[in-house]
């Protein structure tokens, strides 16, 4: 195992909450609806993150808790029943309705599990109700997907069929390319979780081999293991290196020789490496500081160091599941500084002291750092962009080279005007 420098830090944090994950989950499952039980702040957050026009009809909404609800002066359960009835009558195409808890609903101890159970009885055969928490009190924003998938695992039927299960939301075109690669190497029974329709949950069992596409699904993985699924240990499919090793790990689990994998992947990998070169010219030798937010930080650091030759100052991550991240840690250079958790003020002090060329951080920190002359990249863009797979490696590198190019152009123009 790589001898990385592991550290833990606690204190004030700066992260989005798990409600943000609704933005990509509702796109993934168009027959589902996500009803947040929360405040007006919750509603503004999701609306802003999704960029949806006010007259559109998105597949998410907020049942707003008013002051009288929070004060216990009204029956929030009755009001929620009314909202759900109105929603189902207006949107009969909904097949699964997620009741999503928030910080306010958790503070007043609103029992959404019981609400979901009663609604399932009332709408039996028409709509399925599932509940999970998107609260940001103890979690970061990508863990909203973990909560949603964990809530679906008990609904997955059992099977003894041998299959590969890709777990974690992927862009549809990325998923299609992965399935084509797996089919070409001889793995033909491949399914995805979450599926493209919420009512088409894959069946699972002792012959299901799980290959994680996202690193932030610890609770979902735990429940899949309890159902008998095997977990394939692999790096995550970011960049040429990560994607190749990811496919090789799946091939090994199905006893397919690695030569077959390289035969299929080699042309893709060669094209991707050539496409990365123009970005590498910009990124090579640049100092990188990753602040914790998405749990993608370790995989991104590995890609940017190994394939783009960036220098890693510090790699922050909100949480570190060593079992899931072991293969990634093995690919990092020795003595890479990894900090689990966050004390945002101390980390910002280290950012300023290290004078990085690029900081990957949350939106709330980006503008203040830019005002200090430090180039930034929003970490939330990594989950809104199709970055997985060999074909996307150059696009992933481009997400990091563009801020540096922009900064060079702005600096040149500023000097020219003086």
From Swiss-Prot:
Question: Is Phosphoprotein included in the keywords of this UniProt record?
Answer: no
- Please tell me the species this chain comes from: Prochlorococcus marinus subsp. pastoris (strain CCMP1986 / NIES-2087 / MED4)
Q: Which domain of life is it from?
A: Bacteria
- Answer whether the UniProt record assigns the keyword Lipoprotein to this protein: no
Reported cofactor(s): [4Fe-4S] cluster
Cofactor mode of binding and number, as noted:
Binds 1 [4Fe-4S] cluster per heterodimer. The cluster is bound at the heterodimer interface by residues from both subunits.
Which gene is this protein's source? chlN
Q: What is its EC number?
A: 1.3.7.7
InterPro entries (UniProt xref): LIPOR_BchN/ChlN (IPR050293), Nase/OxRdtase_comp1 (IPR000510), Protochl_reductN (IPR005970)
Which lineage ranks, top first, belong to the organism behind this chain? Bacteria, Bacillati, Cyanobacteriota, Cyanophyceae, Synechococcales
Indicate which residues the UniProt annotation says bind [4Fe-4S] cluster.
Answer: 17, 42, 103
Can you say what this protein is called? Light-independent protochlorophyllide reductase subunit N
Q: Which reaction does it catalyse?
A: chlorophyllide a + oxidized 2[4Fe-4S]-[ferredoxin] + 2 ADP + 2 phosphate = protochlorophyllide a + reduced 2[4Fe-4S]-[ferredoxin] + 2 ATP + 2 H2O
Q: What class of enzyme is it?
A: oxidoreductase
């Amino acid at each position: 195992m790589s001898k990385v420098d592991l550290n833990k830090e606690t204190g004030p944090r700066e992260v989005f909450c798990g409600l943000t994950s609704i933005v990509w989950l509702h796109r993934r499952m168009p027959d589902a609806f996500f009803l947040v039980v929360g405040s007006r702040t919750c509603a503004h957050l999701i609306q802003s993150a999704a960029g949806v026009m006010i007259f559109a009809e998105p597949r998410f909404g907020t049942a707003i808790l008013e002051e009288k609800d929070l004060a216990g002066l009204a029956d929030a359960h009755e009001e929620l029943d009314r909202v759900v009835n109105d929603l189902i009558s207006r949107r009969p195409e909904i097949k699964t309705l997620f009741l999503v808890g928030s910080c306010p609903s958790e503070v007043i101890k609103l029992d959404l599990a019981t609400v979901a159970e009663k609604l399932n009885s009332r709408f039996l055969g028409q709509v399925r109700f599932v509940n999970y928490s998107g609260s940001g009190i103890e979690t970061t924003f990508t863990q909203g997907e973990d909560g949603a998938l964990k809530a679906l695992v008990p609904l997955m039927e059992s099977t003894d069929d041998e299959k590969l299960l890709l777990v974690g939301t992927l862009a549809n075109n990325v998923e299609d390319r992965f399935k084509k690669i797996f089919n070409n190497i001889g793995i033909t029974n491949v399914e995805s979780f979450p599926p493209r329709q919420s009512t088409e949950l894959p069946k699972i069992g002792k012959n299901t081999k799980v290959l994680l596409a996202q690193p932030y699904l610890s609770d979902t993985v735990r429940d899949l293991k309890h159902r008998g699924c095997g977990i394939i240990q692999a790096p995550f499919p970011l960049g040429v290196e990560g994607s190749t090793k990811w496919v090789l790990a799946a091939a090994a689990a199905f006893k397919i020789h690695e030569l077959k994998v390289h035969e299929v992947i080699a042309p893709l990998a060669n094209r991707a490496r050539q496409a990365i070169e123009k970005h590498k010219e910009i990124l090579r030798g640049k100092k990188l500081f990753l602040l914790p937010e998405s749990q993608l930080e370790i995989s991104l650091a590995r890609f940017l160091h190994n394939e783009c030759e960036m220098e890693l100052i510090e790699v922050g991550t909100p949480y570190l599941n060593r079992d899931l991240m072991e293969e990634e840690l093995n690919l990092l250079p020795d003595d890479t500084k990894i900090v689990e958790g966050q004390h945002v003020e101390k980390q910002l002090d280290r950012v300023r002291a290290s004078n990085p060329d690029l900081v990957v951080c949350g939106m709330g920190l980006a503008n203040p750092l830019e005002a200090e002359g430090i180039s930034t990249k929003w970490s939330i863009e990594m989950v809104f962009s199709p970055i997985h797979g060999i074909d996307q490696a150059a696009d992933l590198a481009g997400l990091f080279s563009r801020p540096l190019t922009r900064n060079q152009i702005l600096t040149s123009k500023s000097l020219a005007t003086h």
